[in-house]
Structures are given as C-alpha cells and as structure tokens.
C-alpha cells in the first residue's frame, strides 16, 4: 500500500520507552556525539531532548549514554553498546512490521499461522519447494530420527530424516508446526513408482522447459518443482511419479 506509515512504540514498566521521536534523537547523538547538536538536528529543544533521555534512562535495563570528558574537542556524548543494539533492534522491528502489513494484501497467506506468515515476509531461500505442515510422529531408525509431517493436500506424510540432536534442538513434538524445504534437483522423476520408496507421489507435468518441470498433484493442486536433464523424455500433461529422499529435506520451525 502506498503512503503507509506504521509507527512503532515500545513501553517498559507501562511507561513509554522508545518511539520514532526518541529513536531519531538517539541516532543524531550517534552521528554527532553532542546532545545539544542532536537536539537541533532532531528539531527539539535542548530541555525536551534531556527530558526524553532522562525518561528513557530511568526505565532502561542498561545505560544508554556514556559521557566523554576532556580531549581535543572537550569531550561529548556517545551511545552505549546497549543503545546501539536497541537502535538496530528498532530498525529490524520496523522492517518486520512493514513486511507483515504488506502480506495483508496476499489472501493466500494464512494469518492464523505465525510460522507461515513469518516465512512469507522474511525468509528468502534458494529452495523452490516449500511446504508447511505439522509433526505427526517421530521414530528412531538406524540412529536417525525420522519425522513424519502431515502436509495438507498430500495423501501421506512427508518423511524427514534428521539427527536426534536436531530433533531436540528444534524441540519437535506432535502437532508442532514446521516448514519443509527442498531444492528442485532433489525431486526425482520416474515413469513408474519405485518399490519401498517414501515421499513418493503421482503427479502430472504442468509445464516443462529445458531446465525444470512444474509437477502438480492432481487431487489438491499442490505443485513441485523438479530439475530435468532430458526434457525430451517428458511431455506436458504426462502422468509421472516423483520422490524425494528423506535426508534431502530441510526442516525448520520457530523456537
């Protein structure tokens, strides 16, 4: 949306801690090293600048300013490392907030899923195939943890093989929402189904070029992207089978 302005305010102890006006003041101090000059640049009075800084320091978990006395230019004021990180966090939250607002226009993004929404507005990945699902079960097979993930629209769970340490680090439990990613070269195409092959589905070739094919699972319109090495071997609308190895699927989740 054009001309959209989203103002971020952070409160601590039920009192205003930081807002756009205070952020600008801190950034001016960061640039010039002088509260007096920073107040002029931020177009506020010196007294108002001091009032803002005093109010922030009063409730801040750590000091925001450090005074340097003496020296060639008579000293000045600098931001503490905590204040610099606070500004970085504020910028990050502003960008995240703006991205989040823009996905309101994309009705394909469900807003009742934090993982889905977060991934859509912040995650950039080279993996062409990205799906969201929920953990159905976990099994230990040959010292590996095989995670079954239910993906809406697929007849059987996608199986992902990860280490037991990864399972613990991701805090996987039944029904936890996860994201699955795998690159196009990892999607293998065959004319007939393979025996004892997990993650195998019948699909139709929707589009085809010299490098890749878009394959559609007819029952739910879920699409996969696969790299092709011999495009002349396949035809549009041809029914084929695809499979993805368990260890070539990346599993991600929110903490």
UniProtKB/Swiss-Prot annotation:
Segments carrying the region annotation (Required for dimer formation and molybdate binding) are 125-133
A Pfam family (short name) is TOBE
A GO BP entry is: regulation of DNA-templated transcription
GO molecular function terms here? cis-regulatory region sequence-specific DNA binding; DNA-binding transcription factor activity; molybdenum ion binding
Keyword terms, alphabetized: Activator, Cytoplasm, DNA-binding, Molybdenum, Repeat, Repressor, Transcription, Transcription regulation, Transport
On the tree of life, the source organism's domain of life is Bacteria
Give the range the annotation lists for the signal sequence.
none
| GO CC annotation | cytoplasm
Can you tell me which family this protein belongs to?
Belongs to the ModE family.
Q: Which ranges does the entry annotate as DNA-binding region?
A: 34-80
Q: What does this protein do?
A: The ModE-Mo complex acts as a repressor of the modABC operon, involved in the transport of molybdate. Upon binding molybdate, the conformation of the protein changes, promoting dimerization of ModE-Mo. The protein dimer is then competent to bind a DNA region, upstream of the modABC operon. Also acts as an enhancer of the expression of genes coding for molybdoenzymes, both directly and indirectly.
Compartmental location:
Cytoplasm
Q: Which residues form the Mop domain?
A: 124-191, 194-253
Name the InterPro entries on file: Mo/tungstate-bd_C_term_dom, ModE, ModE-bd_N, Molybdate_resp_trans_reg, Mop_domain, Transp-assoc_OB_typ1, Tscrpt_reg_HTH_LysR, WH-like_DNA-bd_sf
PANTHER family on file? DNA-BINDING TRANSCRIPTIONAL DUAL REGULATOR MODE, TRANSCRIPTIONAL REGULATOR MODE
Give the species this sequence originates from.
Answer: Haemophilus influenzae (strain ATCC 51907 / DSM 11121 / KW20 / Rd)
Q: What is this protein called?
A: Transcriptional regulator ModE
């Amino acid at each position: 949306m054009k001309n959209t302005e989203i103002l971020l305010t952070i409160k601590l102890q039920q009192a205003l801690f930081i807002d756009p006006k205070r952020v600008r003041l801190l950034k001016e101090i960061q640039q010039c090293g002088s509260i007096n000059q920073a107040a002029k640049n931020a177009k506020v009075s010196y007294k108002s600048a001091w009032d803002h800084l005093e109010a922030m320091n009063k409730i801040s978990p750590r000091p925001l300013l450090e005074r340097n006395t003496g020296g060639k230019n008579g000293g000045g004021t600098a931001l503490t490392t905590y204040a610099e990180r606070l500004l970085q966090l504020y910028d990050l939250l502003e960008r995240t907030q703006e991205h989040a607002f823009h996905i309101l226009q994309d009705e394909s993004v469900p807003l009742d899923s934090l993982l889905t929404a977060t991934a859509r507005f912040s995650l950039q990945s080279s993996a062409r195939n990205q799906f969201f699902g929920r953990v159905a079960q976990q099994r230990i097979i040959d010292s590996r943890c095989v995670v079954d993930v239910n993906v809406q629209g697929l007849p059987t769970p996608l199986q992902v093989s990860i280490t037991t340490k990864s399972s613990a680090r991701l805090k996987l439990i039944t029904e936890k929402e996860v994201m699955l990613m795998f690159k196009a070269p990892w999607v293998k195409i065959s004319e007939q189904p393979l025996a004892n092959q997990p993650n195998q589905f019948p699909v139709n070739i929707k589009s085809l070029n010299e490098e890749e094919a878009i394959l559609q699972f007819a029952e739910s319109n879920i699409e996969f992207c696969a790299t092709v090495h011999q495009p002349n071997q396949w035809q549009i609308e041809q029914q084929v089978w695809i499979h993805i190895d368990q260890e070539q699927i990346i599993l991600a989740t929110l903490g």
